[in-house]
Structure formats: C-alpha cells, structure tokens
Amino acid sequence: MSEILKRQRLSERIADNLRHYPIVAVLGARQVGKTHIARTFATSESHRFDLEDTATAAALSENPNSILGALKGVVVIDEVQELPKLFPTLRVLADREDAPAKFVISGSVSPNMIRGIGESLAGRVATLEIGGFDLTEAGVKNWQQLWLRGTHPPSFLADTDSDSIGR
C-alpha cells in the first residue's frame, strides 16, 4: 500500500487560509507529509525552496529579498526552521501593498520556528499542524490497518504489516 494518500481536508484548509493570510505555516513531526502537501501549492518548480539543500539555504541566506521578492504566486519554503533569519524577510514581503506572492512555509516544530512565527509573523500567518492520518483520510475500509499500524504515514503506507513495524 505504499501509495500517497490525498489529504483533501488539509489541502482545502491550506487553500482557504491562503485566501485570508499572506503566509501559511504547515507544521508537524517528521514524515507526516508536510513537504508533500506544501509542494502541491507552489506556482511552479522555481517557486519551491528546500532549506535542507545547502546551496538553496546559502542563496536565501545571502539575498532573500532579491530571490523571493521577484516571485509572484505561491512560494513554498520547506524546512524553514533551518534559516530563522528568513522570518523578518517574510514579514516584509507579506506586508507589501500589492502582495504579489503568498508563502507556504513548512517545517518541524522547533523553538526557532515558534519564535520566528511569534515574533516576526504575528498577524500575517495561519498555522496548521499536521499529524498522522485520520479515519477519513485512510478510508473507513482501512480502519483495521489504521488501528494495527497506527496513524504515522510511513507505518500506515508500508507494503506489509511486518514492514510497518519500527517505521
């Protein structure tokens, strides 16, 4: 069953929040699908930034305004907790009068992330926490698998019950 489940309700919540806020933060534990769902909102491949990539992080660290400020549409920044000094730049970009870009930022809940959101992005960001699958996402027909394997996506989506152990 190693397919990706669509998280329709979560996608709808992100889309709705993008209509009302310039920034949507998608937070959660490792491997719950933050990156996968956030990337679906990027206007194009050039609007996706993964801050675990050292070259990307270095470029955004040196000149975030020139890189992000020129973009229009929805920009996705993954693992944003890796570059906390980006939060003030996001605040400036979110406050632009014409607001040509909206941002979906994702990352693991960390002190840097919480501090950055609380100090720099207050009033500009909607925060959504992602957890494991729920019954509506897994499907009622899979209730036993959800009960046996748990809600953590890698475990639930493993090919076999034995493969799901320890994931």
Predicted regions and their residues:
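Phosphate-binding site recognition
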Residues: 1-167
